[in-house]
Amino acid sequence: MASIKPSPHLGQGPRVALRHLHRRDYAEIAALTRESAELHRPWLGVQEPTVEAFEPRLERFGRPAHEGFVICLRESGAIVGGVNVNDILRGSRQCGTLGFTAYAATTGRGYLTEGLGLVIRYAFGPLGLHRLEANIQPGNTRSLSLVQRLGFRCEGFSPAFQVIDGEWRDHERWALVSGNVRPTVPEGGAAGRR
């Protein structure tokens, strides 16, 4: 009897799968980032995707307070989005801060919504978190709509929250608590299922 290899995916939905970011993803992510420069510029500033910038990112995701994921198409494995859970706090807090990126070639197809649903399930399941926060600039209507669809609630406004492209930018703080999750992925696509 042949042994069944475990899936490299942390979760699968109908169209996308979730897995950890790997060093081998650099070339594909660099190309996607370059192609998406105009999409990202207003919210992330100018970011040249160099190996020198990618390596520290991988190192950061190797630490307990950070998780880095890619959302990829189930059929081809092509990367369609990136997600980070940063600043993970344990103890009495059990929370993390969510960051996410779509790529120009695949925006508007619902891949990021499906993939973030998998990340949320993974964060509130195997990661053991109770709360996720997302800090989003007020003019970033696509990201604001996305977190609203996923059930996040606006909890406040943070003036001059983060430096982007040399200037302090305001952000809205959105949060989701584990008991308030909206189903965005059919149960058959549960995170961690093999």
Locate each region found by the language model.
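Acyl-donor (CoA/ACP) binding surface of acyl/acetyltransferases
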Residues: 1-28, 32-39, 68-194
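A short helix-loop-beta-strand connector motif used in the catalytic cores of GNAT acetyltransferases and
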Residues: 58-70
